[in-house]
Amino acid sequence: MPFVVMITGIPGVGKSTITRLALKRTAINFRLVNFGDLMFEEAVKQGLVKHRDEMRKLDPMVQKQLQLRAAQRIVEIARDEPVLLDTHATIRTPMGYLLGFPKEVIETIRPNFIVIIEATPSEILGRRLRDLKRDRDVETEEQIQRHQDLNRAAAISYAMHSDALIKIIENHEDKGLEEAVNELVQVLNLAVREYD
């Protein structure tokens, strides 16, 4: 049975770092798939964008088509190996927040777990300000908290349509990255039973 763990969190929460470190410690090899990368590859192929950060400004219907194509590719990959799906539950666009996984997309992927990485708005804002590699929108701490709240609500909706379990992992400056990584490893190691 395919085993897919979705890992999500708003930009600057530390999701990529936690994911990278956890994958070095799992009992089984996971294929790390970035949902945005799959969408970006398809968008470039169609001549829609040149830079990844332009995707969130595409027409929502175009984004949904890209999402569905990416979901189909994930299902193909998960037939052969467990997938850790690095993604965003919601995407802030100029028109409002877009669900990262409309109903037909989440029903296609059917993840086993949805892991949400969270931190305080001030921690996220500080991390964003230190990350000069990305062209991120500027948000206030209140907007950051709203985005995290929307991610939780989206995860509940996704779980309703996929029977996934939800795990929230906190990545606070004082808690330590190590603890967050260990929590993710525990979830990922559940895949061992599926691929033995």
Curated annotation (Swiss-Prot):
**Key word Cell wall biogenesis/degradation present:** no
Q: What is its EC number?
A: 2.7.4.3
Q: Detail the disulphide connectivity of this chain as listed in its UniProt entry.
A: none
Q: Recall the GO molecular function terms of this protein's record.
A: adenylate kinase activity; ATP binding
Reaction equation(s) it catalyzes = AMP + ATP = 2 ADP
Q: Where is this chain's protein located in or outside the cell?
A: Cytoplasm
Q: Which GO terms describe its cellular component?
A: cytoplasm
NCBIfam families attached here? PRK04040.1
Give the protein name, as stated in the record: Adenylate kinase
Per the UniProt entry, what species is this protein from, by scientific name? Thermococcus gammatolerans (strain DSM 15229 / JCM 11827 / EJ3)
Gene transcribed to yield this protein:
adkA
